[in-house]
């Protein structure tokens, strides 16, 4: 084998090993965040509110689009495009009820129209709050900023989306349904819903969080969400056609639970993609493998830093939430903070309030360093000690030196004294 081939194989093996190491860190981190943020419960809440707000929201959107006479011309094409590509099953039944409900909103008086607008705004606000909760953004948007965002979504959003759908539908019915190479062009156009889904998820992850999101992270999350969305469509269609449970139980009313279930799946996909984007930016990017200098109290300082921040927040009435603490906890990475918090909770040194915030569950004037040190598992004591900095911890360094000296004096004895030797063997 050539030296170049050997070198390439070594580089490939190194990259594969680094990838596996990253996945071992990333996947558990994402799963814990997924469970902590109660994504499935949040998706159910959003699905219920979406079901209630869907008709008011679409009524507002269509009223904006109806300002342009062009939309009326292509309304049927847009209708076909939407229900053929984004509603996987029972589309005809849903379409019939959908446009009937939309038509009923035209007779709503002015006060009722304002109420519909408020319901639509509440849905957008809930989506904004849920996505920002994943990033643990607790600072609310400024009133003017929030109003501008929501109003833009309700006005410019429909215009942009509507124009795109009109163009897509026009191309579908005038260019791709006749002429040569029909099969090839139809196959190319079949990817258009994927592009639309990708753009929708990308904008959701890039613009909605009131937090800096890296472009590549948003793109990666959009790819994942689009792929999950397509899988959900296939699975949902298979389920409805194979196991007609809802239709058997509810009959003509089955459209309601079916629509709710489909909206629920969409929100599970969207929030899962948001968790993925968040975790890409929050998880530890690399595992430091270099050998560190021996330290008797290694890892203890990170634990003290976590408890200190919780105690300070408790004193000033600004309780600490996990993710906020994980990202601002003096440089300690999120996975390590999670482990520390779990140990402190298990030993009843801290507890979680009803609002999901942390508070000390012990008297720091009575609990000693030895009490704390004795409960820490090995994985905590081999941490990075990223929190050690500044003059505040000088006394801890002095304590560590004293403990190391005492330990060295006690252990400064040959191994032969403690290794059992058989009789007759030379000592």
From Swiss-Prot:
<feature type="transmembrane region" description="Helical">
    <location>
        <begin position="188"/>
        <end position="208"/>
    </location>
</feature>
<comment type="similarity">
    <text>Belongs to the UPF0761 family.</text>
</comment>
<dbReference type="InterPro" id="IPR023679">
    <property type="entry name" value="UPF0761_bac"/>
</dbReference>
<feature type="transmembrane region" description="Helical">
    <location>
        <begin position="251"/>
        <end position="271"/>
    </location>
</feature>
<dbReference type="InterPro" id="IPR017039">
    <property type="entry name" value="Virul_fac_BrkB"/>
</dbReference>
<dbReference type="Pfam" id="PF03631">
    <property type="entry name" value="Virul_fac_BrkB"/>
</dbReference>
<keyword id="KW-0812">Transmembrane</keyword>
<feature type="transmembrane region" description="Helical">
    <location>
        <begin position="51"/>
        <end position="71"/>
    </location>
</feature>
<feature type="transmembrane region" description="Helical">
    <location>
        <begin position="147"/>
        <end position="167"/>
    </location>
</feature>
<protein>
    <recommendedName>
        <fullName>UPF0761 membrane protein Cphamn1_1013</fullName>
    </recommendedName>
</protein>
<keyword id="KW-0997">Cell inner membrane</keyword>
<feature type="transmembrane region" description="Helical">
    <location>
        <begin position="107"/>
        <end position="127"/>
    </location>
</feature>
<keyword id="KW-1003">Cell membrane</keyword>
<feature type="transmembrane region" description="Helical">
    <location>
        <begin position="218"/>
        <end position="238"/>
    </location>
</feature>
<keyword id="KW-1133">Transmembrane helix</keyword>
<keyword id="KW-0472">Membrane</keyword>
<dbReference type="GO" id="GO:0005886">
    <property type="term" value="C:plasma membrane"/>
</dbReference>
